[in-house]
Amino acid sequence: MSDLKKGLYIISTPIGNLEDITFRAINILKSVDFIICENPKHSLKLLNKFGIKKKLYSLHDYNEKLLIKRIEKSQNTSIVALICDAGSPLISDPGFKLVQNYIDKDLFITSIPGPTSLVPALQLSGCPMDSFAFFGFPPKSNKSIKLLVNKIVNIGLTSL
């Protein structure tokens, strides 16, 4: 896949079984210049399984702006992958500022679909799937949890 465009590839990764990754995702990961991930130690399990050796940059909420500055000079000339520890990046994960940075600079960006926990959770729930709301991880404080529960109860949609 050496004909990849320079830009950002948001790549879904397996949730539990490493073999759930797509062939396309593996080929792109083999072709990128570097990979932005949450936890390099965790990501290496996947990458090593498929013989992928790339420079890894760790991304967290606290270092996202710094990471953007760090890669800024190479954004126009690099093929970059964004992965998370499990599933689809950006769903309850850091990275939206990075994506917004690429959008603001009118740089190429695409999503490589794959494993996600949302659809299986909906499928196995037995609830209607035509309309639903996703709330991510629950808050930590009891007060915030109560507010969220009230919001979910009153929304009238299948809620995750």
Language model features with spans:
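Beta-strand/loop-alpha-helix module characteristic of Rossmann-like adenine-cofactor folds
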Residues: S2-K6, V119-L160
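Short amphipathic alpha-helix with an adjacent loop that forms part of the alpha/beta core around
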Residues: I68-N76, V153
